Amino acid sequence: MSLKVFLQAGVACAALSLAGAAGASAEPLKIALVETLSGPQASTGLLYRAAVLYQLGKINEAGGFNGEKIQILEYDNQGGPVGAADRVKAAIADGAQIIVQGSSSAVAGQITEDVRKYNLRNKGKEVLYLNLGAEALELTGSKCHFYHFRFSPNAAIRFKTVAQGMKDKGILGERAYSINQNYSWGVDVENTVVANAKEIGYEVVDKTLHEVNKIQDFSPYVAKIQAANVDTVFTGNWSNDLLLLMKAASGAGLKAKFATSFLDQPGNIGNAGAIAEGHIVSTPFNPEANGEASMAFAEDYKKVTGHYPSYVEPAAVFGLQLFGEALKNVKPGEGKINTTDIALAIENASVKTPMGDYSMRSDDHQAKFPMVVQEVSKKARIKADGTEYGFLPFKTFTGDESIDPVQESCSMKRPG
């Protein structure tokens, strides 16, 4: 089944669910996907959509919640905070008790604040926000609150594991450079890279923050990196800022390895080709990392959606697996949805995903799960973007090994 057909089927199922629940006595659980579904960043939003429909479809196949199919509502946030704010209001007006989103930390910052403020004004009618992929540290730091849960890594998790994995393999070296986009995510990455240097055993000899998606020629930046004589380049760059940086590095003959967070974004390997070989990424999934379990998931996901899970999809699926497990422990409350009970159940839930043990830390609502450090290689079983290259895993960290400490800035007020 193609992704297009699958998505159309998912929308149809959601519509049927809406119709079927109309006469039911129990209040249906409505989940609103508030995601970037149009515009230049829609490719990532559509991946989240595929993951949400895949896993919520699994939950509905198993009986849904409280004897009813979960209703899936969709709203296009158009890639920005203003659009997201409007769509969250619309979703709540339409009866959604849970908001899901992932493809932008700026959008996530808007949504989490909107949800927090709404909940303060509407005691007993609180809305949950399930963050599938926005990774800014502040979301589980200064902006943490009881009704927000993050199911993805953050900068601290990604760059601790990628550095330690490279160190353990003997490919990190001693001298490192940090180059990142100049906004919250890039600053988080730079701070993490610097903070980890002494413990893991490398020196950050220089660092750069640059404009986001405005630079066409990274040659001057690469010249600066080359002059620093480094072994590893840490970068949280994504999209063209990653591709153009790596192409400029290859053109200049830079020998340093790139330690990245988003090298697995669809299209990156297709565009970079041989330039990407040997470079490193740390993510929550690799189909070869956990034997039959991880490969079986990859094949099932492809069967349903038309493509192998990659980039943001696995983390979203695994997070919703935990959510589904939590729902099993929520008792019906006189036919009404109680999101506080659901939130408490998520805090206490654990699940065995295709990558291993997955749980939620109650202190700040940061999920805990394995991370896989992997390199671009021709030896990978599943190839990326129709090329001869894929991602070959060489180090897996458990959730306990991967997760970062609770940030001091998180002061979560609990209900009651």
From Swiss-Prot:
This is Leu/Ile/Val-binding protein homolog 4. It comes from Brucella abortus (strain 2308). Residues 1-26 form the signal peptide. The keyword Cell membrane does not apply. Keywords: Amino-acid transport, Signal, Transport. Pfam families: Peripla_BP_6 (PF13458). The keyword Repeat does not apply. Belongs to the leucine-binding protein family. SUPFAM superfamilies: Periplasmic binding protein-like I. It comes from the Bacteria. GO terms for biological process: amino acid transport.
